[in-house]
């Protein structure tokens, strides 16, 4: 199914064509859509073939925890769309971010992260990783390049940020972060969930690793949970620290769990993702199910046209909200006058995605009343699908954060997150308008 030759053919095609055809090419009399391989095991007829699997000398499958042909096709498609050299799917976006850090960090290491990130990521970095002995230091992503570089320590192993902060909508200066990471001799890892490769491909601006919650725009229909890591193939894992020691021995030194195999020597520009699957997916079991891979793959086939409509609707809704007397403020990088408009135009010229944040005059109580009066728009703990949805992050996605931490993450107590769907633009605006009018 698919294969290397077909992937090379697809790289010469335009983005829209890659969305539709991706990594899969049906043979004669075979299904047009990717098949769902719902099997835990794979049969072999001699011990040698199985031994090759355990030594990572064969691309075939042996056990569903380590992947399946259906999941493989999604991984290849995500890598193709992001312009990467390899992809690796996980059970969720949280899992994708976690293993991207664990792949290169261990107890005693240090990570630098932009402060304006998804609440779940903030807790993962600030609480769970700290318990594992990995310190994540948060900082203002708008700091000058030299100030960011100055935060590095000898044990710093990664620089992390989100293309579009969730839900602050701060636009990450990708080239600045890439330059900072190069100066620190660490990989730049960026979560591209909100922008998607339809609007921004961070690897083109110097990112080394791209992560996704495919649960959002990639799937696009609210049907499947998943995550993905895409490797840029543009980082030298043999880099050494000031003392001449390897900074990333997990990739560039012998691995004790594979009889001394050196992942970077053997797999080159696919070393990061290969180790993710061979070690972390193997050990942690955060595997994507074949059905979720299938549904996400189906969603990706319409990614380009969906994002175009999300952007069109969002821009119209933003113009409506900015002029409504009951709206106190609005943050949408696609809106002229927004603080991050110029950065959005630079990195996302086709549009700043379909998510925005705004505040209703009257604060938190007024915001809650607004939500209760919506009829078409849904109150759900989700973004990035075909339905227009709203949420109050301070009491939901960022609820575990202290008030001080919420403010630091860009979460105003009255902030409303709005994910604009694919309904008729006028219908969306009419529903928002009638709910706002009832707050007066």
Give short role names for the model-derived ranges:
Residues 1-16, 322, 437-440:
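Basic/polar N-terminal segments that are highly enriched at the extreme N-terminus
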Residues 8, 16-28, 86-323:
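Conserved PLP-enzyme active-site core in the AAT-like
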Residues 6-68, 76:
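N-terminal "arm"/small-domain region of PLP-dependent enzymes with the aminotransferase-like
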Residues 230, 357-359, 419-421:
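Short hydrophobic/aromatic beta-strand micro-patches
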Residues 284-293, 298, 302, 307-309, ...:
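Conserved small-domain helix->loop->beta segment predominantly found in fold-type I
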Residues 4-6, 126, 135-137, 154-157, ...:
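PLP-dependent enzyme catalytic core of the Aspartate aminotransferase-like
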Residues 83, 155, 326-329, 376, ...:
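Glycine-centered tight turns that cap/initiate beta-strands
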Residues 46-95, 120-128:
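Conserved N-terminal alpha-helix of the aminotransferase class I/II PLP-enzyme fold
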């Amino acid at each position: 199914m698919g294969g290397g030759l077909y992937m090379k053919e697809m790289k010469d095609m335009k983005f829209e064509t890659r969305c539709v055809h991706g990594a899969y090419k049906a043979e004669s009399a075979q299904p047009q859509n990717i098949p769902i391989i719902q099997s835990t095991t794979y049969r072999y007829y001699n011990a040698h073939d199985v031994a090759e699997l355990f030594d990572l000398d064969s691309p075939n499958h042996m056990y569903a925890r380590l992947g399946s042909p259906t999941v493989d096709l999604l991984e290849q498609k995500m890598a193709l769309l992001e312009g990467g050299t390899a992809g690796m799917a996980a059970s969720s976006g949280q899992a994708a971010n976690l293993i991207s850090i664990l792949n290169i960090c261990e107890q005693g290491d240090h990570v630098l992260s932009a402060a304006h990130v998804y609440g779940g990521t903030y807790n993962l970095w600030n609480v769970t990783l700290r318990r594992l002995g990995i310190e994540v230091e948060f900082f203002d992503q708008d700091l000058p390049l030299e100030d960011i570089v100055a935060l590095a320590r000898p044990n710093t192993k990664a620089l992390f940020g989100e293309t579009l902060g969730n839900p602050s909508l701060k636009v990450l200066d990708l080239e600045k972060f890439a330059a900072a990471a190069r100066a620190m001799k660490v990989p730049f890892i960026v979560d591209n969930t909100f922008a998607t490769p339809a609007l921004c491909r961070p690897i083109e601006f110097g990112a080394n690793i791209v992560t996704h919650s495919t649960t959002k725009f990639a799937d696009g229909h609210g049907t499947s949970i998943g995550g993905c890591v895409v490797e840029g193939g543009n980082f030298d894992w043999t880099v050494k620290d000031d003392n001449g020691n390897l900074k990333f021995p997990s990739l560039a030194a012998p691995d004790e769990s594979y009889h001394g195999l050196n992942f970077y020597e053997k797999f080159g520009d696919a070393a990061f993702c290969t180790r993710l699957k061979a070690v972390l997916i193997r050990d942690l079991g955060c595997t994507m199910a074949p059905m979720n891979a299938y549904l996400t793959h189906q969603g990706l086939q319409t990614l380009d046209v969906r994002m175009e409509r999300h952007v069109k609707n969002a821009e119209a809704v933003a113009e409506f909200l900015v002029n409504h007397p009951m709206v106190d403020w609005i943050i949408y990088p696609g809106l002229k006058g927004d603080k991050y408009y110029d950065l959005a135009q630079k990195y996302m010229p086709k549009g700043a995605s379909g998510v925005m944040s705004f505040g209703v005059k009257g604060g938190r109580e007024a915001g809650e009343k607004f939500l209760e009066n919506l009829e078409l728009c849904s109150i759900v703990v989700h973004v990035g699908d075909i339905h227009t949805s709203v949420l109050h992050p301070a009491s939901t996605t960022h609820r575990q954060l202290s008030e001080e931490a919420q403010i630091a993450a860009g979460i105003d107590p009255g902030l409303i997150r709005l994910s604009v769907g694919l309904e008729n633009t006028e219908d969306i605006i009419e529903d928002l308008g009638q709910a706002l009018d009832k707050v007066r």
